[in-house]
Amino acid sequence: MEKKQNLTASNPETVTIFRAEYEKFLGQEQQLLSQNERIFRLENQVSVLTEALRLARHKQFGASSEKSEEPLMEQLSFLFNEAEVFAEVSTKQEEAVVVAAHKRHKKHEYTLDNIPEGIPTKQVEHRLEGEELVCPQCGDTMTEIGKEVVRTLEIIPAQTIVREDIYYTYACKSCSENADEGCETPMVKAPKEKNIIPGSFATPEAVAHIMTQKFVMGSPLYRQEQDLNRRGIPLSRQTMSNWILRATENYLTPVYEQMHKELLRREVLHADETTLQVLHEPGKAPQSESYMWLYRTSGDTNKPIVLYEYQPGRGAKHPEAFLKGFKGYLHTDGYAGYHNLPEEITVVGCWAHARRKFDEAVRSLPKGKAKGSSASQGLTYCNLLFRMEQEIADKTAEERYEERLKQAKPVLDAIFAWANSRTAAPKSALGKALNYLKEQWPYLTNYLKDGRLELSNNRAERSIKPFVIDRKNFLFANTPKGAAGSAVMFSLIQTTMENGLDPYRYLTWLMHTANHADLTDTQVVQSLLPWNAPAELYTK
């Protein structure tokens, strides 16, 4: 050892060579570590992009249904060690019946089209006459012995007629004959009907038709203009737009405001929002996004209300202002803006959104890799919760509350423990699903607090869908005033249909009645609400 130390000490060049090689080795090791880190990042990026590509392809070419292909109890096989948690769950299979060594799938039930009773009927009789009645055998005249009735359906396009109101003037003939003696001739004229839009030739029927074509059938005003022009009626889209806005402002807005007051008195609501492009929004570019907000009642009422509200942004201040005075539960999606509402509003999360994210994670996996994966397990947990809700749907609110504590609470505890035991790349589909579940957990479990609450916010999504579909036709609103008017129109029409009314007949009745009413009187406006409409306005 002493000899080796002496050798090193006597040869400083050797020390220098050893040190240089050592530093070179360290540099290569550091470079290798950096390359490995870069490879790891790139592999993760490729994995995320591949998932996104599979998901995009599925959305474009695959089935849109989120229904699971495996029966629920087969999906639950990975939970065999927690069987006591699910002991209350029904094991019946509704979609397939196992017979011998094969499966017999449930037949699809078709709804046969038919002509309902009560439709106006036109009878056309087909009889034989003259020589047609001569018997080909003996030449005698044949007599009627029976008939066959064949029912078919005729559809007559909307008819357009001109209504002429003729107001007669009356005078006293006797006074007229004695006019020379200083007798004035009194004249009386039949009182005029008040036009719903002064100075126009609009009628409640015409305006209601334009409204329902645009907001129920999704036919933009330019298409209605073309249709009217083909029938020889030169009615411009500008005129129709003005009619809608004037009628909305004068007759529909008071009813909308009263429904807003009624909405705030309810204890369970739903909310959602979607984008809308408004071309002439002050201080904003035409390409920027504004928002249509939706607020509606839940399934605990027989007087449903659906209200839309236009706002230029998506800030939390908008739902806070609209819901001022409301105290109760609000079903929402995971948007953070709802989480900053006043404390008297309890936000209830949406399990349909959580399930959708796990469903996307499953669909993003390579073919054959889904079964048994963490994404599939998360989806199975969500399916179990929805199955439980189906089984208690017909129970009272109090019974649902008790059943959820008994059945769903243990499942929720198991889901949370399972989610905390899983890891995934944050940007992967599974990572996003797990992150959503953990972040939204306090809101996702709030539905346990009251039996009237629902597992998802699908009720709001279904109500905002008509606007989303119509938006594909009209694309944008021209002005904020027009967007606000559209919100009132959608509100009246969707609330009308939810209450079982025919929107055209209701709007016609509403404008006829409101045209002669004092809309500053709350009781008068109350009488115009959809659930107070006459029975003949309801759909058959």
Where do the protein language model's features map onto the residues?
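Short, flexible loop/hinge motifs at secondary-structure junctions
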Residues: 1-201, 241, 270-271, 404
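Catalytic center-proximal scaffold of phosphoryl-transfer enzymes
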Residues: 2-5, 19-22, 132-133, 143, ...
